[in-house]
């Protein structure tokens, strides 16, 4: 959806938008998701959902952009640019070829919706929802230092470990992605 330039300019002048940026700077995003949802619903027909999702992306909260976009998709309004974020993924880790970015990103979206601080009730952590035991094992295999705190604080670290693990499964199952995916217990 193309958003009117004047609407976009007025959107970014709003106090709530300034508050979202301030909360991001202060690393205090407890209320950010609620503010973004409010902003998304202000004027849907003119593009408030797109602007709210873009704002979430601007502050690197892809998880919030996905949530806004998902809600819109239930009403047949599709904002795929924000519903399926694209971030950098490795090509090789310790000489192991990593699957293409689209595969890694689809796993991240399914597992955590791009929430870097995600913690599951089972104990899985970060973007790729790595279990601590798996992360320790993979870190050793990849010649990386294991750090439990980095699983939720360092997205690149989490993606590197998870990608290395997935690449190993694909090798183990002779390149069969579907079989590898069904054996995925990050």
Residue ranges of model-derived segments:
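Conserved small/polar residues in nucleotide/adenosyl-binding loops
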Residues: 182-186
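Cell-wall glycan-active module
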Residues: 1-178
